Amino acid sequence: MSQFDNVSVVKKANLYFDGKCVSHTVTFADGTRKTLGVIFPAALTFNTGAPEIMEINAGVCRVRLAGSDEWKTYGAGQQFDVPGNSSFDIEVTETLDYVCHFG
């Protein structure tokens, strides 16, 4: 899906890691929430509350989920799942355009 219709968008950006990750929250009519964002080249660790699906629209990254020693590479058109109440390490080598689906 290249477009989300009938949504509410929070104008104020979510800024993380000194601006290395910037996103906007989008809420759908049914209450579902997603964030649309960009991560600039960096090595970061994110913590999750709810389970997440990270959909990659552009860019390249390597990801290591909590409890794993294995790094996996993801690019445009791919996605990875992160359990709730967990974390993941991400190394972005090409600016990453993503959609984060919660729940």
From Swiss-Prot:
Gene3D superfamilies: Jelly Rolls
Catalyzed reactions per annotation: a purine D-ribonucleoside + phosphate = a purine nucleobase + alpha-D-ribose 1-phosphate; adenosine + phosphate = alpha-D-ribose 1-phosphate + adenine; cytidine + phosphate = cytosine + alpha-D-ribose 1-phosphate; guanosine + phosphate = alpha-D-ribose 1-phosphate + guanine
Keyword Cytoplasm: no
Keyword set, alphabetical order: Glycosyltransferase, Transferase
This protein's GO CC annotations: cytosol
EC numbers on record: 2.4.2.1, 2.4.2.2
InterPro entries xref list: Ppnp (IPR009664), RmlC-like_jellyroll (IPR014710), RmlC_Cupin_sf (IPR011051)
Enzyme's top EC category: transferase
Domain of life from the UniProt record: Bacteria
GO molecular function: guanosine phosphorylase activity; purine-nucleoside phosphorylase activity; thymidine phosphorylase activity; uridine phosphorylase activity
SUPFAM superfamilies (UniProt xref): RmlC-like cupins (SSF51182)
Role according to the record: Catalyzes the phosphorolysis of diverse nucleosides, yielding D-ribose 1-phosphate and the respective free bases. Can use uridine, adenosine, guanosine, cytidine, thymidine, inosine and xanthosine as substrates. Also catalyzes the reverse reactions.
Family named by the database record: Belongs to the nucleoside phosphorylase PpnP family.
Official protein name in the record: Pyrimidine/purine nucleoside phosphorylase
Protein source organism: Cupriavidus metallidurans (strain ATCC 43123 / DSM 2839 / NBRC 102507 / CH34)
Taxonomic lineage of the native organism: Bacteria, Pseudomonadati, Pseudomonadota, Betaproteobacteria, Burkholderiales
